[in-house]
Amino acid sequence: MTDQLTHFNEQNRARMVDVSEKDVTKRVAVAESQISMKPETLARIREGRIEKGDVLAVAQVAGVMAAKKTWEIIPMCHPLPLTGIDIQFAFEDETTLAITGTVKTTGKTGVEMEALTAVSVAALTVYDMCKAMDKEMIIGPTSLQSKTGGKSGDFHRGEK
């Protein structure tokens, strides 16, 4: 892996990296986020008793949509033909909802940003739908857990 930043041109100005010479490979990225809240807020999400509707269903769709639109909101991301997006939720304890996003493609560049965007927007959607009853919710940490495929090789958080 190189320490050289590739998103700058010879004038030291931002540019989108040219991936035209890269090989097409299967690429998968997994990101995680979480949102912490009052126990009664999480209980109401679990029971489907939030006024705005089914929080997890809406957050799941928002996460999928966000992954598909990542290239439109992150300036140097390439538009990618995503082949799979999965958003999953887990009730970690009485105050924490974990969100995992898996994004797949077969292409010349990875889908790390799409996975990170997906879980971030899913968490923001949970916040939006529950803020009337709990303004003290905290989002994060958000992190890339793994990525496979591509020239830089595989990454799995916690492995050296």
Swiss-Prot record:
Keyword vocabulary terms for this entry: Lyase, Molybdenum cofactor biosynthesis
Source superkingdom: Bacteria
Organism: Brevibacillus brevis (strain 47 / JCM 6285 / NBRC 100599)
Active site: 128
GO biological process, one term: Mo-molybdopterin cofactor biosynthetic process
Described purpose of this protein according to its UniProt entry: Catalyzes the conversion of (8S)-3',8-cyclo-7,8-dihydroguanosine 5'-triphosphate to cyclic pyranopterin monophosphate (cPMP).
EC numbers for this chain: 4.6.1.17
Family, similarity comment: Belongs to the MoaC family.
Keyword Lyase applies: yes
Keyword Lyase assigned: yes
Subunit comment: Homohexamer; trimer of dimers.
UniProt cross-references to InterPro entries, sorted A to Z: MoaC, MoaC_bact/euk, MoaC_sf, MoCo_biosynth_MoaA/MoaC, Mopterin_CF_biosynth-C_dom
CDD domains, alphabetized: MoaC_PE
Signal peptide extent: none
Biological pathway: Cofactor biosynthesis; molybdopterin biosynthesis
GO molecular function, one term: cyclic pyranopterin monophosphate synthase activity
Binding site for substrate: 76-78, 113-114
Catalytic reaction equation(s): (8S)-3',8-cyclo-7,8-dihydroguanosine 5'-triphosphate = cyclic pyranopterin phosphate + diphosphate
Protein name in the entry: Cyclic pyranopterin monophosphate synthase
